[in-house]
Amino acid sequence: MGNPKKNSKDFAPNHIGTQSKKAGGNKGKQMQDQTGKQPIVDNG
């Protein structure tokens, strides 16, 4: 129980930190891409 708890704690902050950084970068890039992709998607 001690092992999984330690692993989970290390994984939780690591995952959130990585996701936050990835989401922020992806969101920024996607937002700009959405401007040009939105009309294409609407057309499609």
From Swiss-Prot:
Q: Which residues cross the membrane?
A: none
Matches recorded under InterPro entries: SASP_SspN
Among the entry's GO cellular component annotations, what is one? endospore-forming forespore
Give GO BP annotations, semicolon-separated. asexual sporulation; sporulation resulting in formation of a cellular spore
Q: Which family does it belong to?
A: Belongs to the SspN family.
Q: Which NCBIfam families match?
A: PRK09398.1
Name of the featured protein: Small, acid-soluble spore protein N
